């Protein structure tokens, strides 16, 4: 009897342990596959591609790569003497046409005052037409002067905002063309996190929900708020052929890969360039409130850390 009881006890204990293990594995699987988190997240920032609006030789480069600059700080300067001469020429044209317009205005006024009693209507009309032509030339010269002045101002390339100069690839003595990107400026205090969440996890992602961001290789946890969720992503399995007909890729019905949707997360505190734009992180959406880490069990903390390893 005792032997039978002992066997039943062992069987019952084994069965209970198996059931508990199954429940633990099932909960871990659900937690891993359905909870709103992703390792596919990246720090991003607003980046300005700085390109000159004039062409010429670069005479001075006032910054170095990865330097923190202030708004309106001079980055580099393009050949100013050429544009100064162009402005001087334009100003000389304006001065010439101003004098000429004054002469033609006096002549037209005199003829209009004398009237047809002293000269023909044709001569009066001719004087008025000449005045209008000169005034048109004066306006054109003034526009050319204003453009030359603008070009001269734009030979000095300034930072459009506070930020970090990166990928600086211009040097004094080089010729740069109009519109060619010379340097990128990563705006200060513009960093955010772009998390690519699987579509199966979007149920737990809403604008305003709180988020935890763990940079790769760091134990520090940053806080943030879901700012927005992308309204659509590209359908990679559907394209059009040369005649505009739909081309659909073949898929296995029993294998469905979840699409990833961009989710923009606003950081509570800007971290400068401690984690540069493009570096990766793990993001966990905790819901309407921040997670109280002090209340987490050992297994929950372990699950959070396992996310770092996939």
Swiss-Prot record:
One of its GO terms (cellular component) is plasma membrane. One of its GO terms (molecular function) is transmembrane transporter activity. Keywords: Cell inner membrane, Cell membrane, Membrane, Transmembrane, Transmembrane helix, Transport. This is p-hydroxybenzoic acid efflux pump subunit AaeA. It is a single-pass membrane protein. The chain crosses the membrane at residues 12-32. It is found in: Cell inner membrane. Pfam families: CusB_dom_1 (PF00529), HlyD_D23 (PF16576). Belongs to the membrane fusion protein (MFP) (TC 8.A.1) family. Gene3D superfamilies: 2.40.30.170, 2.40.50.100. Forms an efflux pump with AaeB.
């Amino acid at each position: 009897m005792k032997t039978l009881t002992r066997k039943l006890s062992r069987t019952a204990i084994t069965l209970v342990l198996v059931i508990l293990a199954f429940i633990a594995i099932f909960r871990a699987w659900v937690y891993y596959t359905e909870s709103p988190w992703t390792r596919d997240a990246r720090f991003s920032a607003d980046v300005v591609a700085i390109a000159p609006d004039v062409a010429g030789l670069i005479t001075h480069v006032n910054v170095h790569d990865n330097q923190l600059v202030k708004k309106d700080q001079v980055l580099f300067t393009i050949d100013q003497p050429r544009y100064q001469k162009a402005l001087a020429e334009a100003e000389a044209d304006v001065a010439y046409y101003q004098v000429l317009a004054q002469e033609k205005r006096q002549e037209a006024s005199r003829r209009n005052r004398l009237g047809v009693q002293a000269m023909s209507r044709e001569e009066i009309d001719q004087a008025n037409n000449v005045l209008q032509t000169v005034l048109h030339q004066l306006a054109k010269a003034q526009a050319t002067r204003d453009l030359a002045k603008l070009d001269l101002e734009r030979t000095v390339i300034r930072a459009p905002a506070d930020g970090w100069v990166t990928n600086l690839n211009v040097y004094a003595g080089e010729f740069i063309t109009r519109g060619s990107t010379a340097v990128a400026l990563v705006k200060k205090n513009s960093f955010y996190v772009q998390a690519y969440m699987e579509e199966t996890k979007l149920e737990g992602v809403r604008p305003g929900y709180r988020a935890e961001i763990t940079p790769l290789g760091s134990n520090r946890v940053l806080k943030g708020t879901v700012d927005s969720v992308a309204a659509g992503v590209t359908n990679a399995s559907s394209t059009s052929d040369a005649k505009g007909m739909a081309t659909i890729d073949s898929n296995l019905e029993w294998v469905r890969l979840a699409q990833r949707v961009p989710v923009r997360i606003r950081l509570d505190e800007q971290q400068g360039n401690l984690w540069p734009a493009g570096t990766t992180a793990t993001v966990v959406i905790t819901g309407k409130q921040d997670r109280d880490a002090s209340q987490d069990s050992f297994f929950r903390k372990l699950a959070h850390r396992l996310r770092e390893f996939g």
